[in-house]
A protein has these predicted regions:
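Bacterial N-terminal signal peptides that target proteins for export
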Residues: 2-13
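Lipid interaction determinants
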Residues: 15-17, 21-90, 94-174
Length: 174
């Protein structure tokens, strides 16, 4: 009887072992889906500029469109100054973006009454084209080289802040 019980248990164990081996051989290892790299690509429309004194500028006093796609960018900005003159910028360039670094190279720019009176096609001077990126609460934060601006990108758009001067609010439209 003990021999029969032992043989029965051994056979059951062998069947279980065979089933597990078959399952292991024929099952596929689950691999996690690859994570897509972080991206700030999109087309953004400037919704408003809040000045340090609380004044809010909205279109048509300020109008801008910023497109970033596949490592290329284009920015067009027009601001009606308090004295009625127009300040503007149109820039095109290249950029790279990762979770820890943003790099930017302005290929061409024309600026009118923006950084200084008159028209210039000189891009801001930079010693390093790259800046560190930090991530917090689903937002990417960095300061593009040479611009003196702090940006914070999220799914809905981004904000751009220049010191004690103003904060721009951009909405992602595409």
């Amino acid at each position: 009887m003990k021999t029969t019980l032992f043989a029965s248990r051994a056979a059951s164990g062998l069947i279980l072992l065979t089933a597990l081996a078959q399952w292991a051989v024929h099952s596929e290892v689950a691999t996690p889906a690859p994570l897509s790299p972080p991206s700030i690509d999109g087309t953004y429309e400037l919704m408003k500029r809040v000045m340090a004194n609380g004044t809010v500028l909205r279109p048509p006093s300020i109008v801008a469109l910023y497109t970033m796609a596949d490592g290329r960018f284009s920015l067009n900005l027009f601001v009606k100054n308090a004295d009625g003159t127009i300040a503007s910028e149109s820039s095109v360039g290249r950029y790279t973006f990762s979770a820890d670094k943003y790099c930017e190279w302005i290929v061409y720019t024309i600026r009118n009454n923006l950084d200084k009176p008159g028209v210039t096609n000189e891009a801001p001077a930079v010693t390093d084209h790259c800046a560190p990126v930090t991530s917090k609460d689903g937002r990417f934060n960095f300061s593009p080289p040479g611009e003196g601006v702090e940006v914070s990108f999220g799914a809905e758009g981004f904000t751009a802040k220049i010191g004690g001067e103003f904060v721009d609010r951009w909405r992602k439209i595409r």
